[in-house]
Amino acid sequence: MGEDSTGAGANGVDDGSRDAVRVRIAVRADVPAMVRLLADDALGAAREQLDGAIVAEYRDAFDAVDRQPGNELLVAELGGVVVGCLQLTVIAGLSRRGVTRALVEGVRVAAQLRGRGIGATMMRVAMERARAHGATVMQLTSDASRIDARRFYERL
């Protein structure tokens, strides 16, 4: 925990305040911001909730992910504010002579900040972390109805 990567220079993000996006391992205190990001479109709003007792369910889920080896929740910060998140899971496999895979899901960037390189920086960091864990294949899940997200992934 506590490791981070900064996307500066060509891969960084300039929001006018000279703050670069910083990608780091999520902590429990990030859960409300992450859920808000997950609910930041019509599909997510139908799936996610952030009120009262439900927050405890998300914190329990965070704890379960955090305890499971090979699972990482990453957040992107800009100016100290969480503006993106994703989940990276490293999976041992039998196929391809036992190749280790990485699965990326739950990728979100705040709607008002899309198109500024934050998602690309998050994916670059996820790929670096996956390689560091021995993964040689990376898979990504995305809902077919998220057309803009699919276009983004196709450009990577």
What residue spans do the PLM features occupy?
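Acetyl-CoA-dependent GNAT
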Residues: 3, 11, 16, 25-99, ...
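Active-site acidic-Proline motif in GNAT/NAT acetyltransferases
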Residues: 110-112, 116
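Residues forming the Rossmann-fold NAD(P)(H) cofactor-binding site
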Residues: 116, 120, 124
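Conserved GNAT acetyl-CoA-binding A-motif
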Residues: 123, 130-142
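Short glycine/proline-centered loop/turn elements that form peptide/ligand docking sites
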Residues: 123, 146-149
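Conserved active-site tyrosine of GNAT-family acetyltransferases
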Residues: 153
